[in-house]
A protein has these predicted regions:
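Charge-dense, helix-prone N-terminal extensions
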Residues: 1-153
Length: 153
């Protein structure tokens, strides 16, 4: 697996949206962030060469959930995700830690865990027809942009 294949797979899951944030991290959300979607996986697009020998180097971090978290940490190449371990995220050092089917199972489980935690209001928005959902997201982004502009003044 690699970042491109992971992205292609994740975008086939229901309601998945991706954004690039934090200088070179591809973030996957269940539902658009503008309507309250929640993040479930983060893929490092660029590996800083200074991190090559760093023990905290990672290619992906994702939500493992409290049941699977400790089990995954026993596997070589997996460690608590920096800044997100308290919410049961794990980080993986390289793509060869799992086979393709295992990656798909792990990330599908992360998606399902996150979807289950979405508030009812967000789930209702995700159940709307695509065109209506798109309008809602555009309206919400306008509101958020106006709030940000007012705050900047």
């Amino acid at each position: 697996m690699d970042a491109e294949r992971i992205r292609a797979y994740l975008l086939t899951l229901p309601h998945v949206v991706d954004t690039v944030q934090w200088s070179g991290t591809l973030v996957f959300w269940v539902g658009d962030k503008a309507i309250g979607g929640k993040m479930f996986a983060m893929v490092r697009l660029e590996q800083d060469e200074s991190l090559e020998r760093d023990e905290k180097r990672r290619v992906i971090s994702y939500s493992a959930g409290p049941e699977r978290y400790h089990e995954l940490l026993e596997r070589e190449g997996i460690f608590p995700a920096p800044y997100a371990a308290r919410i049961f995220y794990v980080a993986v050092r390289s793509w060869d830690v799992f086979r393709k089917t295992e990656w798909e199972q792990e990330l599908s489980a992360a998606h399902a865990l996150t979807f289950a935690k979405l508030p009812e209001k967000v789930r209702a928005a995700l159940a709307l027809p695509a065109a209506q959902q798109k309008r809602l997201i555009a309206e919400r982004r306008k509101v958020l942009a106006a709030k940000a502009a007012a705050k900047a003044r």
